[in-house]
Every structure is written in structure tokens, then in C-alpha cells.
Amino acid sequence: MYEALVNALKATGIPFAEFQWSTRPAGDFGVVQLERSVATVEGDGEIQERAYEGSVDLYMQGRDNSKIALVKQVLTAQCGGAYVLSSIQFEEETGLLHYEWVFQLEGE
């Protein structure tokens, strides 16, 4: 399920990075950054269950409702109701709006 989320976010066409950016894209852009952690339940020496929790961060110059809608559409399709808009911030250092959604997924 996590890989499906990654692929769906990449398919939006919004520049994408998993974990962190090595360089920031130039120009007027929307950027999606995905971070996650994994929790497992083990039994009989094997992983029995896995769950992912993470955040999807969208950075933009100005408000672009189409990019916000794309991210929400992907999260709804991949996570069902297991996500929430955690914060909207203005990043003074970069001049970007920063939207952060927190999600949970069952693992494969």
C-alpha cells in the first residue's frame, strides 16, 4: 500500500521527493515531500503485521487549489479516511505555503 501511495503521488506531476530534497526545484512550483515511519508486529520469528504512519508535505508559492485537490484525491484513494490536514504554515525563510497531511496505512 505504501508503494501505491508513492506511485500515485508521483503520477500527479507535482515535483516529488521521498524523505528530503537534495536541491529545491526552481520557479513557481508545488512540491510534495513524503516522510514515513514503519511499525511492525512480529510473531514466530516473522513480521505478522506492518503499518505506516507519515506525512505528505506540499510546498507552494501562493495558494493553488488544484494541487491541494490532487494531494487530497490521492490520500483519499490510497488511505481512505486515515489522514488529516495537520497544519498550514507560511515558511518565512523560503516564502512558501506549507500544507502538511498526516496519514496511516496498513502495510503489505
Question: At which residue positions do the language-model features occur?
Answer:
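Acidic-leaning, charged glycine-interspersed low-complexity segments
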Residues: A69-E108
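Oligomerization/assembly interface segments of phage tail-like spikes and tubes
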Residues: Q48-G62, L96-G107
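Glycine-rich loops and low-complexity Gly/Arg-rich segments
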Residues: E42-D44, S55-Y59, G80-V84, E108
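Small/polar-rich, solvent-exposed N-terminal microdomains that initiate assembly or binding
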Residues: M1-D44, R63-K67, E93
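Short intrinsically disordered coil segments
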Residues: G45-A51, K72-Q73
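Generic preference for well-ordered secondary structure
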Residues: I14-F16, T40, A51, S55, ...
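Generic hydrophobic secondary-structure signal
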Residues: L5, L9, V31-V32, V56-Y59, ...
